[in-house]
UniProtKB/Swiss-Prot annotation:
PROSITE patterns to which the protein is assigned, alphabetical: MOLYBDOPTERIN_PROK_2 (PS00490), MOLYBDOPTERIN_PROK_3 (PS00932), TAT (PS51318)
MF terms in GO: electron transfer activity; molybdenum ion binding; molybdopterin cofactor binding; trimethylamine-N-oxide reductase (cytochrome c) activity
GO BP annotations, alphabetical order: anaerobic respiration
Source organism per UniProt: Haemophilus influenzae (strain ATCC 51907 / DSM 11121 / KW20 / Rd)
Protein name: Trimethylamine-N-oxide reductase
Residue ranges crossing the lipid bilayer per the database entry: none
GO cellular component, one term: outer membrane-bounded periplasmic space
Cofactor: Mo-bis(molybdopterin guanine dinucleotide)
Amino acid sequence: MKKNNVNEQRRDFLKKTSLGVAGSALSGGMVGVVSKSAVAKEAEMKTVVTAAHWGSIGVVVQDGKVVKSGPAIEPAVPNELQTVVADQLYSERRVKCPMVRKGFLANPGKSDTTMRGRDEWVRVSWDEALDLVHNQLKRVRDEHGSTGIFAGSYGWFSCGSLHASRTLLQRYMNATGGFVGHKGDYSTGAAQVIMPHVLGTIEVYEQQTSWESILESSDIIVLWSANPLTTMRIAWMSTDQKGIEYFKKFQASGKRIICIDPQKSETCQMLNAEWIPVNTATDVPLMLGIAHTLVEQGKHDKDFLKKYTSGYAKFEEYLLGKTDGQPKTAEWAAKICGVPAETIKQLAADFASKRTMLMGGWGMQRQRHGEQTHWMLVTLASMLGQIGLPGGGFGLSYHYSNGGVPTATGGIIGSITASPSGKAGAKTWLDDTSKSAFPLARIADVLLHPGKKIQYNGTEITYPDIKAVYWAGGNPFVHHQDTNTLVKAFQKPDVVIVNEVNWTPTARMADIVLPATTSYERNDLTMAGDYSMMSVYPMKQVVPPQFEAKNDYDIFVELAKRAGVEEQYTEGKTEMEWLEEFYNAAFSAARANRVAMPRFDKFWAENKPLSFEAGEAAKKWVRYGEFREDPLLNPLGTPSGKIEIFSDVVEKMNYNDCKGHPSWMEPEEFAGNVTEEYPLALVTPHPYYRLHSQLAHTSLRQKYAVNDREPVMIHPEDAAARGIKDGDIVRIHSKRGQVLAGAAVTENIIKGTVALHEGAWYDPMYLGESEKPLCKNGCANVLTRDEGTSKLAQGNSPNTCIVQIEKFIGVAPEVTVFKQPKQVA
């Protein structure tokens, strides 16, 4: 299947499958039409409004079974992730009942842990499973204390104010004595640690300059390592789906959109943007080349740098080569990043002469020395002097959760916290409520090397000795780097417990698996738009729990009961009482804002989203506008109160892999350091048809799989040199592992780099019989490096990786990860 016209193919698919064609969208009829126009001979049919990370969904139920789903609010660009509710509910991949690994059941806590992932499974009753979980956790806590239990449980799970599996797990852990948690995440591991030193805020999860300001004032927007058409289909809560509308409006205005990326992304194609191909993991040299040109031509804003930044002079010495003997000229940069020197110089001229918004993505900081990318982007924006002006400066979240969509005036619903009975107050999802924690991306290193000491953001951390792992709502055997090392790491704990909907790779690596409901089998609430907060969505139960699945909340209530802390855990509230309390938090806030909201009972009965409007101030809001207007009255949260291009705090940490100013430090593996054995760079972008690994098991897989494998994008010249044709099954291998994939030969990837989307389910062949078992399905992280970005952030760095690719010869093994695992008869 050719990939050059990927958007056209997707649009054709959408035309064939959209609920608009079938007679269903809320604005065009999803809630109203299906239920009211059903012909008399049809069985009873109803439409239930719910929501997911991928938006508000109308679900058609007939005779108690889901028959169709689609958007409850018609999006600007169709979102087929909303069409597979039935696949999720009735999948053969579901965990249908409590299961225990055979060897573990025979010898709980003392089993042969090397059998994880390849042992048979035994069906047990819920009481037996819950007793086993309780007894194992109690044993570990009694023998090793709270630092023996890891319950960080990172993952996207499901949106919802109550049924947030990780929060519910940690609430239970806090009620029973504590746990080991984590610091940071896999999305922005490097940036969220360095940005507070530079800007005084985490920045990556902050509201952006309003899109209304962008439309009015920006001349150029630059999508730097960002693919919003893919990443804005989802949100941490539920996507408001408005960001892409603004991109389309900007395109319609005729203004310039530039995409700097190793791949010609779906966004770049849809917007017909200018594509500047750049070698993977070389964004910093490109930025330095632009910055050097600005100085060379006297186009950097000296007044802005003097008034609003700190330490620029020290950085300029590095930029001009006074400290290391290497001026960071456009010609120097071109040799590294692959962008011609003349193009680099023209970018400098264009950015300096036009109101430019640099929209930085997160993929470029998921590399060795990833702290440098966003630090350098902020430095470049500072040199342009447009920060705090309408339509100018930089933004690090325009591609995520529809950043920049104006924040509505209304109310924000409450949510369950990880601290029972109100202790420690409400926490955000980034806050850690554990008694000890380590940088999340070091999880395999922690399990393998208890007691090891590492540096993290100026402090020394000692790894705990983890004896029990409890994961609910995550899939580390897809999202963590160097999967084969993770397999060994997960053999270290005495017990691994997983709450899961499906037989994911992580569930298969556990000892005890408890079947959890999907969000369509329970009641909940969520907001639309992590930044816009423009709607409250009901998440109404569509069908009862399927098979023997239980809500995560109910699972932890049962465990809390066994631990004698049920009342503390539930606070005496039922599911609907919790939801009414959360809704009333928004009701009270809306009343204070003089915005009308119906009472909870009426809202719930109406079966539709409740929306708020943004005020004029929100539409005109400019990030750092107040700081620019008066930096003395509105200082940043840095030691100087200014943008810290040079950070004394970071410099004094004396790290050799993160200096006091942004700089280029060559990683061990990247496009400029390939070898004869591994001559290609690998990039692992987000998938279009999944949310990471979620929905990988649905019928959407038929729309992208090549020869029943994850597709790998490869340039025609790289393919021809290896005798690879479009559609061939290929073997990709690195120092760390090997996978099979389906070749997608396309000019939409820079020569010398291949792209394998993250999120394919790990499917090892002959697990336990080889150090590097072949992943039959194409899980990208089998290939990537498990190495911290630097001593500062210790973030994940998958995008500094080199590989080789070859045509697979012989009979390809069957993909089996989407089948039920072996069970004792």
